[in-house]
């Protein structure tokens, strides 16, 4: 849950049962893993479908991907 707390206000990707992937800004969550996303969009291959503000029921969540931060390697 700490990772979710650190991701509040940031973009995440949520994979749901049935293979659906949704990307959006994490606005909130609860202990049951119910998730509130703003600016959400469903990812369908190279296409996206705008969903806006949504609530995802926790028992449908398979995976939550935190924001990926690129850190270049230092050359020594």
What is the meaning of each model-derived region?
Residues 1-76:
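Conserved RNA-binding domains used in RNP assembly and mRNA/RNA metabolism
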